[in-house]
Amino acid sequence: MCTKTIPVLWGCFLLWNLYVSSSQTIYPGIKARITQRALDYGVQAGMKMIEQMLKEKKLPDLSGSESLEFLKVDYVNYNFSNIKISAFSFPNTSLAFVPGVGIKALTNHGTANISTDWGFESPLFQDTGGADLFLSGVYFTGIIILTRNDFGHPTLKLQDCYAQLSHAHVSFSGELSVLYNSFAEPMEKPILKNLNEMLCPIIASEVKALNANLSTLEVLTKIDNYTLLDYSLISSPEITENYLDLNLKGVFYPLENLTDPPFSPVPFVLPERSNSMLYIGIAEYFFKSASFAHFTAGVFNVTLSTEEISNHFVQNSQGLGNVLSRIAEIYILSQPFMVRIMATEPPIINLQPGNFTLDIPASIMMLTQPKNSTVETIVSMDFVASTSVGLVILGQRLVCSLSLNRFRLALPESNRSNIEVLRFENILSSILHFGVLPLANAKLQQGFPLSNPHKFLFVNSDIEVLEGFLLISTDLKYETSSKQQPSFHVWEGLNLISRQWRGKSAP
């Protein structure tokens, strides 16, 4: 009996483990894919970054002692200080993905020119001066391992580092340079040996410094006065032969409450493409969490006075006076009134191929306040406003705009043939279209920040709506100097996408 029970218990244990692990699976709200094209461009940009870094970087001092037998000198103590790389060339450099591991860097046939100060001391003499060091046959290979820390920051680790310099030539300058250059060759070998021993530790030190910078990245970004956006990594990068995927949490929180929304992200798969350097998939979950967080914060509640409505009806061909007179005709009003609109549920997000819609369930109240009296409700009813979401990439942000597709009061079908109901529905639709949506679009102008590498700009960007997620395809451009970012407070010249869902980034 006992022998039969043990396999059953083990089976139950394994099933329980599978259930627990599957129930704890976390899917990303944002998925970023780096392709081989990005790595190839990264080699070019990397050279610019290294050049900029080397202008400010001072290498460790190099010192030692050598005997010069041909001069009958027992020892010469030497010290090279203030070592700076003045020029370099790495013509054969490549980056490649190592599936499941990281990114392999390889360079060979490199050269470098180094300037340095030196000092010599021996039983016969001591002196100081300057020197130039030419290095050739530079070879380096190593693998950068990418993981994440407990706070969702990316971390880097150098593995299998191998670096070698094949040749070194020293040229001394100064009054006795002819003398020193005559015995420079015997010193080149120990210099080469010391440099070869220093290279991998120097590179590892730079990776460590880069990790320190990565650990300070803000994975929680304040979007507005109501919400935060979590950009943290939820898992280590997924690496294949052709690309690297970063899974980011991509969820909005109310400013005062970092609790996950009452719904979970669903998995989505980026299409197998390689024409762009970077692909960013933004899941429906990302937008749903933004909707929920703003709803929780009360952002979707608005009250408009007669004067405020007037300011937004200037584009209405019928004119505000005509609309207000129709309302007054129905309710026999002589005093100013207010319109209060409140979302009754978080707006509903729906992403289908070529179509991004936002349905807003809400209630609308017409209010008035006679002199020396409290606010009175004239009428209150529920409605659903269906809107299309227009998209554009402006700078490094995804900017949205809303346009009204349909406005429908929540009434029994039997009442829809009532002429007065239809008139009122049209009036409220006009108020929403010309009064409320312009206010919403003004707030949406600040956009959502898109995560991108430091000093890299998005260029040749394209937006596509697929089932369940938004796909951004873009190339990258490295900016050596910081330029002022475009303003997000002006809409003139923007080609906002309404029906054509594939678009280029704004110029």
From Swiss-Prot:
Disulfide bonds: 161-200
Signal peptide positions (record): 1-23
Glycosylation site list: 79, 92, 113, 213, 225, 257, 301, 355, 372, 415
Localization per record: Secreted
Family of this protein: Belongs to the BPI/LBP/Plunc superfamily. BPI/LBP family.
Entry-linked SMART domains: BPI1, BPI2
Name of the protein in question: BPI fold-containing family C protein
Protein's UniProt keywords contain Transmembrane helix: no
Pfam family, one: LBP_BPI_CETP
Gene Ontology CC annotation, any one: extracellular space
GO molecular function, one term: lipopolysaccharide binding
Keywords of the record: Disulfide bond, Glycoprotein, Immunity, Innate immunity, Secreted, Signal
One GO BP annotation of this record: innate immune response
Tissues where the protein occurs: Detected in the basal layer of the epidermis from inflammatory skin from psoriasis patients, but not in normal skin.
Database matches in InterPro entries: Bactericidal_perm-incr_a/b_dom, BPI/LBP, BPI/LBP/Plunc, Lipid-bd_serum_glycop_C, Lipid-bd_serum_glycop_CS, Lipid-bd_serum_glycop_N
Recorded superkingdom: Eukaryota
PROSITE patterns found in the cross-reference section: LBP_BPI_CETP (PS00400)
First-listed, main subcellular location of the protein, grouped into a coarse class: secreted
